[in-house]
């Protein structure tokens, strides 16, 4: 399909997951998780500083973005509010773009990230335009 993005190499993924799990993190990946994420129109979801839902064979961008989100929860950047969630999404997209070379993101992932950044920035503008409610 046209929206196909290359999965993160297995060795790299296993190394990152091992480190996260050694700090008490939980990564949920299964057919059921894929179905749930599909119903939410999401590639991945971070619930808190320790819990990530990832679709099977995730892209590098998905994996790194979710780890950025766990850190945002850990540092209190994300308080769960709509506004805070949008600000965290924007910060995560910017970080992915800034470190795209280090993360070895593909051109397609960078383009998708730039699109997502624009969408989140527009959503936040709308939120403020409507009085922040």
Map each language-model feature to its residues.
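Catalytic toxin/effector domains delivered as secreted proteins or via bacterial secretion systems
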Residues: 1-133
């Amino acid at each position: 399909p046209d929206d196909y993005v290359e999965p993160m190499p297995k060795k790299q993924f296993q190394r990152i997951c091992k480190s996260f799990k050694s700090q008490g993190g939980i990564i949920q990946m299964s057919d059921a998780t894929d179905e749930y994420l599909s119903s939410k129109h999401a590639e991945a979801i971070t619930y808190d500083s320790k819990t990530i839902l990832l679709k099977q064979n995730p892209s590098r961008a998905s994996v790194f973005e979710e780890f950025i989100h766990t850190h945002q929860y850990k540092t209190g950047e994300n308080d769960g509010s709509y506004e805070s969630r949008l600000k965290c999404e924007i910060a995560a997209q910017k970080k992915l773009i800034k470190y795209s070379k280090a993360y070895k993101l593909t051109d397609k992932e960078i383009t998708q990230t730039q699109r997502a950044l624009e969408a989140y920035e527009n959503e936040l503008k709308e939120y403020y335009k409507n009085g922040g409610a």
